[in-house]
Design a protein with these regions (language model features):
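Conserved active-site segment immediately N-terminal to the catalytic lysine
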Residues: 1-23, 62-67
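Short beta-strand-to-turn element immediately C-terminal to the catalytic PLP-Schiff-base lysine
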Residues: 14, 27-33, 84
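Charged, amphipathic alpha-helical interaction segments
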Residues: 16-19, 32, 102
Length: 211
């Protein structure tokens, strides 16, 4: 019964535009060490000791300093303001996302040429994407076919061992992730998908594999 992010020293969450909780661009780091917390705050604000809002407190001005190399990576107030309401209704949205996911899963599971990820009943999912696996030789043809039929699909995740930078830097293989990365594509999945959409996606997938 542990929440994700509580089993490690650090956990990183993305609030990118396509995520279930979004502020357009940005993210959050959760950690359990005060020293690391202060360091990360500084690094994310150009290595400064104090952000602008902290330089004048208790009627006294505090001069700032730069104590380390840093980045301009702190979240703006405007971006942050978009998160509060979404977090409050997160559980409510997840119920709807799960229902859509289950309906799509049930429909597509009838197509034997498609591999679907196995869910663990002991783990609560976020239902972020709907990835499927297909024959490597047919994957890119299926992507073109679906896009021509106005079903926008994409490949979200590839094995990093097959990406040029990491392939050159690290000499190792991850056979399972490589195999899945070559087979996978993500179907449309969002809160506005309805039964008609699911039936249409299914019909096009079915027609492709019946050819």
């Amino acid at each position: 019964n542990k929440i994700i992010g509580t089993n490690s020293d650090f956990a990183v969450f993305s609030f990118y535009a396509t995520k279930n909780i979004t502020c357009g661009e940005g993210g959050a780091i959760i950690l359990n060490n005060k020293n690391h917390y202060e360091n990360i705050k500084s690094i994310s604000n150009n290595g400064m000791t104090k952000p602008a809002m902290k330089r004048f407190e208790n009627n006294k001005y505090s001069h700032w300093d730069v104590i380390t190399k840093g980045f301009k990576a702190n979240l703006s107030d405007i971006n942050a303001s978009l998160l509060e309401k979404q977090i409050k209704i997160y559980d409510q949205k997840m119920i709807k996302r799960k229902k859509i996911y289950d309906n799509l899963y049930k429909k597509i599971s009838n197509i034997k040429s498609i591999t679907l990820p196995i869910s663990n009943s002991n783990v609560l999912r976020d239902y972020h994407l709907f990835p499927i696996g297909v024959d490597v030789k047919k994957r890119d043809k299926l992507i073109s076919f679906l896009n021509k039929n106005h079903i926008q699909v994409t490949v979200n995740y590839r094995s990093i061992t097959e990406l040029t930078y990491y392939k050159k830097k690290y000499k190792f293989q991850c056979s399972v992730s490589e195999k899945w990365g070559q087979q996978t594509l993500s179907l449309p999945f969002h809160l506005k998908i309805n039964k008609k959409d699911i039936d249409y996606i299914y019909s096009k997938l079915n027609s492709f594999f019946r050819r």
